[in-house]
Amino acid sequence: MLAVCARHGPAKLPPPPPPLAGERAAAWVVGRWWWRPAAAGRRGVVAARASFFSSRIGLDSQNYHTRDLSQLLWVGPVPGDIAEIEAYCRIFRAAEQLHTAVMSALCDPETGECPVRYDVQTEDLPVLEDKVAAVLGCMLALLNRGRKEVLSGRSGVASAFQGSEDSTMDKIPPLALFRGDLKRCCESMQVALASYLVPSEARGLDIWRKLQRLKNACYDAGFPRADGHPCPTLFANWFPVYFSTVPDDSLSDELEVAFWRGGQVSEEGLEWLLLKGFKTIVDLREEDVKDDLYLSAIHEAVSLGKIEVVNLPVEIGTAPSAEQVQRFAEIVSDSAKKPIYLHSQEGISRTSAMVSRWKQYVTRAERLATQNRSLNGNGKHVRNDQTEQLTNSPGFSSEGSENGTPLESDRTMEGETCDIDIETARHNLEITNSLPSEQSTEQGELHGTRTELQSNFRLESNPLKAQFPSCDVFSKKGMTDFFRSKKVYPKSVLNPRRRSNSLLVSRRKQSLSAEQNGAIDYEAAEFKVLKSSNGASFDNDYILSVASGITNGKPSNNGASTSVEDREMETSVVTVDPRTSDTSNSNGNAPLGSQKSAERNGSLYVEREKSDHVDGNMCASATGVVRLQSRRKAEMFLVRTDGFSCTREKVTESSLAFTHPSTQQQMLMWKSPPKTVLLLKKLGDELMEEAKEVASFLHHQEKMNVLVEPDVHDIFARIPGYGFVQTFYTQDTSDLHERVDFVACLGGDGVILHASNLFRTSVPPVVSFNLGSLGFLTSHNFEGFRQDLRAVIHGNNTLGVYITLRMRLRCEIFRNGKAMPGKVFDVLNEVVVDRGSNPYLSKIECYEHNHLITKVQGDGVIVATPTGSTAYSTAAGGSMVHPNVPCMLFTPICPHSLSFRPVILPDSARLELKIPDDARSNAWVSFDGKRRQQLSRGDSVQISMSQHPLPTVNKSDQTGDWFRSLIRCLNWNERLDQKAL
């Protein structure tokens, strides 16, 4: 997570006062918790309430650099500022951590077990899981849209804000819109998780804490913070409030902090406050607090006398009453209660209103005290001690706001539009209720002073309106003044005039699916997307392919070839038949020479890439290449030949794909070295030394970019000298194959299975080093990793690198005949349907192309790939099949039949395993031994060959490696030699 700092130093907290004598007592009063010290004279009240849906009425703000409360916290940094990028990255990382925790709770990533709640009916669990998965999908879509709008659209947004003054009224920065949408998504996630998880469980506690961190990150406006201030995921909108108002360029270290302000307090936030010595928390929330962890922690802290909690309930959208302001001023003036933390739900509107009124109250009190210190009503001087007694007199305060009159203030709620005159609002302060007068004045010279102070303290203002700045920030004149001033942030930002209903409706109707097509309607924010004549967005990649007009090996353009742009990366894959590989490779140059000669006889042309696939004559005796390119990764070509003829496959974007079964051997060649490698290792802290050694070699000697998983990146980030290691976000790996040229795995077969799970579509070539317990698929020894990696990176330049395209299975779960969202899996080993812990035999109907072929009555059934034929399928009695044989293995598990034997199906088969309605019990399904989940009656799993195989780099050749693994791992056909007669 990005650390956010500012130009000011850390906040200086006064030393904590000694602990108060006596114990604190707790009592339940009219639905509220009242906590007070038994021996103390003051009472503090905290309401156990919190808002379920956060208020969207962010009308006030504060900027750390200027300490100007006219800033709008809900607007956030200026569009295009680096603080905006940092704020988005914080939210992204918090959302990723929540996503990982939720997915781990749904299904344990190590064991693959999906825990079941026995207090919920089995039929209701899939519905609850669907709700959680739906919210996760919505959150992911919002993050992707926010990334495009906040990160990619910085220049476009900044230019949109530099328009006319009238149009600026209707503009809200993309970060503010993104935070608002994600806040509502967090509330939906809280509702969904409340029905699925038990908060008292360990997994429930972890998810709840991460959800609170994400909510705080969304509440926070994103302004920079000083060193020593808490992280935005602990406290949103954390700012110090000073006693005096000074110019912007003054150092905050020289000022005395009156108190701190910010957003809601969570369990982790309370722990931080106690660690820093805070003595008082002032809670402005009027809503019910639904955070049971926080309520339990604060109750314990108050009962032990560690902290005091005072509740001054203020309704959402209103300002505090005069009695509440008095009460708060009394708390601030009491040095025994410092440090003090003032907060509301988000730390925006109600908190800013209280700060504004407190400052006005203190300023007026000081001014009147100064006047009466010079002259009293009779023209005589007033003693200073009496004046100070007046300003700090308890008679100015009340014990609560129960007897106060609610403030009549203009509100901006949904459906209302407020046009606010800024200058009028700043000077037209109104409060109808005056201060209580409970204490009589013994000195006659003080009576006039007190009466004048009470009559003047009417706060002739609506503080919510008073926070609005001028509305010409992004005008030409305003921006010119801003750049000339050389300030980090302007003194005011745009007026958040409510947008018209049509713009709101048009933005809400934006389809998330439209982003995938590249044609997004950004009318609400005046975003422009270049489109082609047919509406599809342009892609600037160039198509490199062979001219379809080649006949008899001769180019149709009389031998003239078009010059091709130098691309960043180029690769080629040559397919060699094992029958001719020995003779053709004897001199080491035969395949390459034939390919070069073919390229000399062919002609290349360049055309603009469109949305449709590349078609045309793929036969390639003239050239033998097919386009496979991305500007961000190495370019690859796939050619198949049996030594007599040459065929070429139609390959989609950045993928090594099957178009028909093949028993030929493939060879990988890079025309230019790759640039990016993904380094994967076993789970946990194991193999970190090996990972450091490989990462250093790849970066320093081979000049490659090294990517690791986020958890591993956190470890590397704490090791000096490994700042070059990069990471990616596990929430969205849809484009990871476009960034990675090949994958290096450290561990056993489980790491390769994990790599297969990371890449849901295309998979880059995988080279694995055996550091696990079995390592059937890992044919490379770690001791020679430098030589093996160099052979892969440089392609051996003449012979290439032999690879095996390992078939995967595409599995999809259906319920009531409809596909379940998010239930699509690519399997490298096998998919298993079994009875689980049920006492009855499982009954599974097996269909092939919608035709019933058999019913499995036993412990279950295995559908395995050739790669998985040496795993669970072998243990169940299935055959062991070479990984290059295109087939599926159908193996029963302990069938209740003497005639049910394993069978092998072609790779064109489309299987469906269904739990019939008359089955005695439900079944369970697992994919590669993980992601285990329940199948109810009527559910089914459809299985077919995946278009995207997993290419693994061989040590020597695919057949030799396979037999060596059989002998090394399974002791295949090991016996003593027969002696001669």
UniProtKB/Swiss-Prot annotation:
Protein's recorded name: Probable NAD kinase 2, chloroplastic
One Pfam family this sequence matches: NAD_kinase
SUPFAM superfamilies the UniProt entry points to: (Phosphotyrosine protein) phosphatases II, NAD kinase/diacylglycerol kinase-like
GO CC entries: chloroplast
Organism field: Oryza sativa subsp. japonica (Rice)
Disulfide bonds: none
Composition-biased stretches (Polar residues): 387-406, 551-563, 581-596
Residues covered by region (Calmodulin-binding): 319-364
InterPro entries per the UniProt record, alphabetical: ATP-NAD_kinase_N (IPR017438), ATP-NAD_kinase_PpnK-typ_C (IPR017437), NAD/diacylglycerol_kinase_sf (IPR016064), NADK (IPR002504), Prot-tyrosine_phosphatase-like (IPR029021), PTP-NADK (IPR055214)
Similarity remark: Belongs to the NAD kinase family.
Domain of life: Eukaryota
Principal place of residence: plastid
Keywords attached to this entry: ATP-binding, Calmodulin-binding, Chloroplast, Kinase, NAD, NADP, Nucleotide-binding, Plastid, Transferase, Transit peptide
Gene Ontology process terms (BP): NAD metabolic process; NADP biosynthetic process
Catalytic activity: NAD(+) + ATP = ADP + NADP(+) + H(+)
Protein's job: Involved in chlorophyll synthesis and chloroplast protection against oxidative damage.
